[in-house]
């Protein structure tokens, strides 16, 4: 009796296939359309809109970040060039002042040398003059002595 | 003796009894439609409540529904592929929701308390008609998907790596709906029977872990059914090179 009920008697049974099948199929197809318009479409719209929003924002942020990085690199190179420029100017000024110092030193040295030379020449000429005079006086004196000696004799 | 009492208990479970509705010449299993209408009604109410006020910052029910949508999309996308999953997502999702709601509704709601003149209320998926209907819809879908996407080239699939595959691939077209329908039917019916028998034999405590196991199987079966349906459709639309 039980086995009869279990495996499909004419009336009832587990494997009793009838018009329930096509009607259930129609019901599921209808449910698909209903759920599509009630659930899948609206929720999908909201979720996809949000996903688009988020991905757009991420792209925008990435662009901004890369722009910032580019600007940073720009600034860095600018800073670098400014630094080298400053260094160049400083070294130029140092060279300049060095040159000026050397020139002034040379000039002063030359001047000192010249005046030293002049003084030496003057000293020499005066020495010579003095010597000349001295020798002349000696000559005079000797002549006088000679003359006096000659006269006394 | 024991066997006899077991048999009477089985008989008390009213296995294979149906509440017949006669409309003209056709006969329907009324209990299947009654439970499915109640469960689908609840599902639709739940969904319309959740989608009533959609916001960009999801709250409450909308959050849950979005999670569900995302879950179904992932399922469809991984099985069917990026190109056509959008067309089939509602169908796969409906299969998943229908099977899931039917299984869980059948297991969670104490239908036994409602007395019918004949048969008893239970999971709509524990009726072979429902599962065969679902499985045939899946078969139609993958044929339609293959033919609409690839035209007559769809039949290249039957001789795909070699023509030797032809008989096996044709056989597959029959075994697919068969295995789909009987897997779901068998699992859900077996779960109902096990719980029913245990409740009769030991009404306290012991059936509870089995009931939890039943809920687990029910969810897994819904996932398996939807995944396989999506996989068959994906197989049909896949391009061979």
Curated annotation (Swiss-Prot), chain B:
InterPro entries: ATP_syn_F0_a_bact/chloroplast (IPR045082), ATP_synth_F0_asu (IPR000568), ATP_synth_F0_asu_AS (IPR023011), F0_ATP_A_sf (IPR035908). It comes from the Bacteria. It comes from Prochlorococcus marinus (strain MIT 9301). It is found in: Cellular thylakoid membrane. It is a multi-pass membrane protein. The chain crosses the membrane at residues 30-50, 91-111, 128-148, 193-213, 214-234. GO terms for cellular component: plasma membrane-derived thylakoid membrane; proton-transporting ATP synthase complex. Keywords: ATP synthesis, CF(0), Hydrogen ion transport, Ion transport, Membrane, Thylakoid, Transmembrane, Transmembrane helix, Transport. This is ATP synthase subunit a. SUPFAM superfamilies: F1F0 ATP synthase subunit A. One of its GO terms (molecular function) is proton-transporting ATP synthase activity, rotational mechanism. Belongs to the ATPase A chain family. Its main location: membrane. Key component of the proton channel; it plays a direct role in the translocation of protons across the membrane. F-type ATPases have 2 components, CF(1) - the catalytic core - and CF(0) - the membrane proton channel. CF(1) has five subunits: alpha(3), beta(3), gamma(1), delta(1), epsilon(1). CF(0) has four main subunits: a, b, b' and c.
């Amino acid at each position: 009796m039980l086995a009869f009920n279990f495996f499909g008697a004419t009336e009832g049974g587990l494997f009793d296939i009838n018009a329930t099948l096509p009607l259930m199929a129609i019901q599921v197809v209808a449910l698909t359309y209903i759920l599509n318009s009630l659930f899948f479409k609206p929720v999908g719209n909201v979720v996809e809109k949000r996903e688009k929003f988020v991905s757009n924002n991420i792209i925008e942020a990435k662009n901004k970040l890369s722009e910032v990085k580019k600007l940073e690199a720009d600034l860095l190179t600018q800073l670098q060039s400014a630094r080298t420029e400053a260094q160049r100017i400083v070294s130029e000024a140092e060279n300049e002042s060095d040159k000026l110092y050397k020139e002034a030193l040379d000039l002063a040295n030359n001047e000192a040398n010249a005046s030293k030379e002049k003084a030496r020449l003057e000293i020499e000429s005066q020495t010579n003059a003095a010597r000349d005079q001295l020798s002349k006086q000696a000559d005079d004196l000797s002549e006088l002595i000679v003359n006096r000696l000659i006269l006394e004799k | 003796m024991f066997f006899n009492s077991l048999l009477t208990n089985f008989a008390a479970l009213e296995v294979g009894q149906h509440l017949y509705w006669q409309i003209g010449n056709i006969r329907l299993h009324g209990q299947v439609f009654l439970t499915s209408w109640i469960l689908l009604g609840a599902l639709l109410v739940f969904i319309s409540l959740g989608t009533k006020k959609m916001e960009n910052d999801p709250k409450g029910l909308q959050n849950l529904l979005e999670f569900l949508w995302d879950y179904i999309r992932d399922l469809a996308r991984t099985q069917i592929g990026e190109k056509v999953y959008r067309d089939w997502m509602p169908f796969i999702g409906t299969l998943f929701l229908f099977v899931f709601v039917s299984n869980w509704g059948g297991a969670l709601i104490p239908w036994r308390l409602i007395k019918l003149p004949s048969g008893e209320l239970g999971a709509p998926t524990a009726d072979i008609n429902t599962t065969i209907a679902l499985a045939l819809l899946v078969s139609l879908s993958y044929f339609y998907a293959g033919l609409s996407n690839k035209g007559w080239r769809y039949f290249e699939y039957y001789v795909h790596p070699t023509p030797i595959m032809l008989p096996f691939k044709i056989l597959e077209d029959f075994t697919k709906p068969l295995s789909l329908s009987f897997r779901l039917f068998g699992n859900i019916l077996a779960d109902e029977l096990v719980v029913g028998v245990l409740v009769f034999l030991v009404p306290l405590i012991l059936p509870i872990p089995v009931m939890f196991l039943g809920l687990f199987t029910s969810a897994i079966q819904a996932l398996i059914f939807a995944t396989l349906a999506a996989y068959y459709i994906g197989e049909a639309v896949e391009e061979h090179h």
